[in-house]
UniProtKB/Swiss-Prot annotation:
Expressed by the venom gland. This is Amphipathic peptide Tx348. Its main location: secreted. It comes from Buthus israelis (Israeli scorpion). Residues 37-67 form a propeptide. Amphipathic peptide that has antibacterial activities.
Length: 67
């Protein structure tokens, strides 16, 4: 009876570990290839606009500090 309980506990812990690691991997892949990360990359292309001056960039940095 003790070995069955230990085996059941071991399987539950193993199941929890695999589901947590799968969620971590999917979350990491979602951050890399997800819609939100692509949108954030699109906003960065405006920093290379030649019409922006150094003062404009400094103002943008101040605005985006707490965003």
């Amino acid at each position: 009876m003790k070995s069955q309980a230990f085996f059941l506990l071991f399987l539950v812990v193993l199941l929890l570990a695999t589901t947590q690691s799968e969620a971590f991997i999917m979350d990491l892949l979602g951050k890399i290839f997800g819609r939100r990360s692509m949108r954030n990359m699109d906003t960065m292309k405006y920093l290379y606009d030649p019409s922006l001056s150094a003062a404009d960039l400094k103002t943008l940095q101040k605005l985006m500090e707490n965003y």
